């Protein structure tokens, strides 16, 4: 019988859910897994081979629309789900499985969901500091999932598949050089406190180009201005080795470009988790956030930050107005880390 997973709203969190997904499939390989999520995070689930069907949530962020949710849930009844894992903590995310009459509905307590979940767990954050472990714990009976260290099985690192035909198209369309490609993701949608200075990025890009690499810039449409600013700061004669794709790729296409890269440089972002899940050498720059909660889950990843007493603060804007955790992280440190990471697959 099929299982319905109500997936997270954010790309990085969806990748963190892959540990649970792969675990569920390993225990019941013949049971289909259906993923319900918003379109932007659902694109990631399409690259998880354990997910048998993806279902787009037809409601915008914050929309309740009880009548429409009821009608949508009634359609899901025909799939005869025997259980549902509700990964977001919101009230809205638990409504549809309950309305669909799914008999087992498993999730953390969250937002006023007492009567909507049949297996309600109370989260002690200190016992489950990593998001991947919080999701994984839902796959076990509550009495076997008291802390991350006590889980009967540790979650596997997330893995996303790449599409070779898509990669070939991207190489041809944008003149990408598989032999020397380095992906840079300079955007920071969370807020400016998470962003390494653009002039640092432009210096890093220049040094990598001087070393013979081709640079591809990746990000969402919200990152396009930062990528244009970065491009403008690179000497014009060197821009033939710089391809700006920020805002021009879908999430699956970003997965495929990253899969072609010799190394990837990102902030703590959704694309950081994408890079980790493709297994590419990764340098992740952490500012106000902490790798304890949402680390890049890959043996090919290293994290960098500049140690300051106020780290981590988890603020969108630096309350002390110095952003030293990132601004004091030197180009030399990042360049050396990228060079060392590239050597790991040389």
Q: What does each model-found stretch correspond to?
A:
Residues 1-346:
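Catalytic machinery of carbohydrate-active enzymes
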């Amino acid at each position: 019988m099929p299982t319905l997973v109500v997936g997270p709203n954010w790309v990085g969190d969806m990748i963190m859910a892959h540990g649970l997904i792969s675990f569920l499939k390993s225990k019941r390989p013949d049971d289909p897994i259906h993923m319900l999520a918003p379109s932007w995070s659902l694109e990631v689930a399409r690259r998880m081979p354990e997910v048998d069907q993806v279902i787009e949530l037809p409601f915008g962020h914050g929309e309740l629309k009880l009548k429409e949710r009821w009608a949508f849930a009634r359609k899901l009844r025909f799939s005869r789900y025997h259980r549902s894992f509700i990964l977001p903590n919101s009230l809205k995310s638990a409504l549809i499985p309950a309305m669909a009459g799914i008999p087992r509905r498993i999730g953390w307590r969250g937002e006023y969901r007492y009567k909507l979940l049949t297996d309600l767990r109370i989260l002690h954050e200190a016992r489950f500091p990593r998001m991947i472990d919080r999701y994984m714990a839902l796959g076990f009976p509550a009495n076997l999932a008291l802390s991350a260290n006590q889980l009967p099985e540790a979650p596997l690192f997330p893995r996303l598949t790449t599409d070779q035909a898509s990669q070939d198209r991207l190489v041809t369309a944008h003149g990408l050089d598989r032999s020397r490609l380095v992906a840079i993701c300079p955007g920071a949608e969370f807020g400016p406190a998470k962003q390494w200075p653009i002039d640092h990025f432009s210096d890093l890009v220049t040094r990598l180009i001087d070393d013979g690499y081709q640079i591809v810039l990746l990000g969402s449409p919200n990152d396009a201005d930062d990528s244009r600013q970065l491009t403008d700061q690179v000497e014009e004669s060197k821009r033939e080795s710089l391809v700006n794709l920020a805002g021009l790729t879908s999430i699956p296409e970003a997965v495929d470009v990253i899969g072609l890269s010799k190394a990837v440089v990102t902030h703590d972002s959704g694309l950081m988790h994408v890079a980790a899940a493709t297994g590419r050498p990764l340098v992740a720059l952490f500012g106000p956030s902490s790798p304890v909660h949402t680390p890049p889950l890959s043996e090919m990843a290293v994290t960098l930050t500049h140690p300051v007493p106020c780290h981590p603060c988890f603020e969108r804007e630096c309350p002390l107005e110095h952003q030293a955790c990132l601004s004091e992280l030197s180009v030399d440190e990042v360049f050396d880390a990228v060079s060392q990471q590239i050597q790991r697959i040389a």
